[in-house]
Amino acid sequence: METFLGIMIPFLGTALGAACVFFMKKSLGDLVQRALAGFAAGVMVAASIWSLLIPAIEQSEGMGKLSFLPAFIGFWVGVLFLLLLDHLIPHLHVGSDQAEGPKSRLGRTTMMVLAVTLHNILEGMAVGVMYAGFLAGNAQITAASALVLSLGIAIQNFPEGAIISMPLRAEGEGKGKAFFGGVLSGVVEPIGAVLTLLAAQMVIPALPYFLSFAAGAMLYVVVEELIPEMSQGKHSNIGTIFFAVGFSVMMTLDVALG
């Protein structure tokens, strides 16, 4: 039950964010979107370092001076995997007018949902890897540290849910359909978590590779998507400030509770 709840927490964050469409009349302003993107980026960077990369290196200490190698390899596989998906799946980043990936007749909103869904899969995988390590009795991964990662991702999923549902509403969709669109982007997280949990449990010795793979994928999303989002438009430091806030929140949660 503990693992099930941990896997579902990030999805709940997305759903609560998407529910903003029922309480807010106007679409999110540019300043708010930049603040939310900065906050999400800060959370993801801190989670990648403290919850994923550091445990991956610690678990490979038996390799001596080469203890960095599994983390290095897994990290690069994660980056290259996201790069491949970027080229294979048509998608549109929030605040951008230029679609990426192969040419497609998909609508703007659909491609925006695909962009968020793409990195939600990876966030689900990160949670799945953490719980796989906990269930395997790994000394570096406790129930608290796995829960901290779930909570951190849920926190940054809240604005993502709103960033999807509010533009849908602004484009004329009904509140129910806009909410469903936001929720749909987060459904893949528990699915990705369960599949990764099962795969990681079958190959526990490769856990450092799985952890660093998730870190590489998450940092790719930060640089490719969130940093441009928090920096676009009229110059403002709001994105940078909220990046620092998100980073501090996740770092504090991980060190204090993990």
Regions found by a protein language model. Name each.
Residues 1-258:
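Intrinsically disordered, metal-sensing/regulatory segments
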